Regions:
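Alpha/beta enzyme core
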Residues: 1-34, 44-180
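Short, hydrophobic beta-strand segments that form beta-sheet elements in well-ordered domains
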Residues: 38-41
Length: 180
């Protein structure tokens, strides 16, 4: 794999709450120069990013970020608005507390609601795996697949329990493999 191939696998991300318009414009310029797959910005910056990306760079955003503690309808509305403003991808955060409680029907319903709201866009679902047991990770992956997610992701990078680790990635791969 060469540098350009690797760059095409990267979402150049800016999700810090203090980000400004000029930060987003600079992010878009960097992404074009580096040849990344996308820029990932907060929903309030989707229109600005869409107007400033070039060189085939896509726009990604988040919903329910970073806590996942938004009602499914709010997540779906946020995602739908972002897609209408130019987002090609949406990274949604599950309500990890519901996963910990084993409320799998709720989890599947919230992912399904966002999936329906993002027709034509990629839907990536963030699980916060550091807060989950192995069994919960596997079950969450299965329910995300059933709900129509395109990808599952380990972590937001903002959760106090931590981020991605080999254990979680292995479980995710064993559960959904190359399907998600």
């Amino acid at each position: 794999m060469d540098r350009n191939q690797l760059a095409k696998m990267i979402d150049h991300t800016l999700l810090k709450p203090e980000a400004t318009d000029s930060d987003v414009i600079a992010l878009c310029a960097e992404a074009a120069e580096l040849g990344t797959f996308s820029v990932c910005v907060s929903p309030t910056f989707v229109s600005l990013a869409a107007a400033n990306v070039s060189n085939g760079v896509k726009v990604a955003t988040v919903c329910g970020f970073p806590s996942g503690k938004h009602e499914a309808e709010i997540k779906a509305s946020e995602a739908k608005l972002s897609v209408s403003q130019g987002a090609h991808e949406v990274d949604m955060v599950i309500d990890v507390g519901r996963a910990i409680m084993g409320d799998w029907d709720y989890l599947e319903a919230e992912v399904s609601a966002v999936r329906k709201a993002t027709s034509g866009a990629l839907l990536k679902v963030i699980l916060e795996t550091a807060a989950l047991t192995d069994e919960q990770i596997a079950k969450a992956c299965q329910r995300c697949e059933s709900a129509g997610a395109d990808f599952v992701k380990t972590a937001t990078g903002f959760h106090p329990a931590g981020g991605a680790d080999v254990r979680a990635i292995k479980i995710m791969h064993e559960t959904v493999g190359s399907k998600l």
